[in-house]
Amino acid sequence: MPRYRLLVEYDGTPFNGWQRQDKGLSVQGILEKAVEKLCGVPCTLHAAGRTDAGVHATGQVAHVDLPRDYPADTVRDALNYHMKPKPVAVVAAELVDEDFHARFSAVGRAYLYRIVNRRAPLALDQHRAWWVPVALDAEAMAEGARRLLGHHDFSTFRASECQAKSPMKTLDVLDVTRVGEEIRIVAEARSFLHHQVRNMVGTLKLVGEGKWSPDDMAKVLEARDRTKGGPTAPAAGLVLTGVSYSASGGKSGPTG
């Protein structure tokens, strides 16, 4: 069966996450229904990352095996037609080797977290950013973020329901920059623990508020205890921006 790789973009606001569920709307469920309308038989999609409820994506990657060959552009256009008016789009589709796997072939994932730091509430971006009205020191947050880089036990930033076999991860990038009233946090790693990015952001906010020092980030990391970390940042500010593959597998998204 021919295998297709899909580059998928979605607004996570109305969804209960990527993963198909018995009840509730899911991105996977919407895509699989569209695939079935295209080819007439049920097909299972596999994604690079199973994003949580409310988390968005501009660079999600999925693959699906179809019962016959279709032009890649036909796959893209047909799926987009059948998904209307849901806020999901297949940006690109391509035929790939049968050994490609959206999840297991990935060598890197990139996320962007947006904080809007101003007194006025958000009228347009309330579902696409975390509104923080208290002044934040982005430079202190950036310094604290550097304490987390490298290979560590990230238990402090791991959700209690995380199913990963090990809390050991290598964090390659955790950059914090301010652009006007917006603070952008970019995180890149081969893979992340459940809620890892949002838990790191929630903890960095404490540094930005001056409640913690940048050195406190190293201390809570060493504690390996979720109760020692900061709160989980809201899902709305998080975007999966890209997934990286080996040279033969290519990459997705602007930061993939």
Swiss-Prot record:
UniProt GO BP: tRNA pseudouridine synthesis
Disulfide bonds: none
Gene3D superfamilies for the chain: Pseudouridine synthase I, catalytic domain, C-terminal subdomain, Pseudouridine synthase I, catalytic domain, N-terminal subdomain
Catalysed reactions, semicolon-separated: uridine(38/39/40) in tRNA = pseudouridine(38/39/40) in tRNA
Cited CDD domains: PseudoU_synth_EcTruA
Keyword match Isomerase: yes
Positions of substrate binding: 111
GO molecular function ontology, one term from the record: RNA binding
Protein's UniProt keywords contain Flavoprotein: no
A Pfam family hit: PseudoU_synth_1
Catalytic residues, chain numbering: 52
Keyword tags: Isomerase, tRNA processing
Subunit structure: Homodimer.
Protein task: Formation of pseudouridine at positions 38, 39 and 40 in the anticodon stem and loop of transfer RNAs.
NCBIfam families for the chain: hisT_truA (TIGR00071)
Family: Belongs to the tRNA pseudouridine synthase TruA family.
Identification of the protein by name: tRNA pseudouridine synthase A
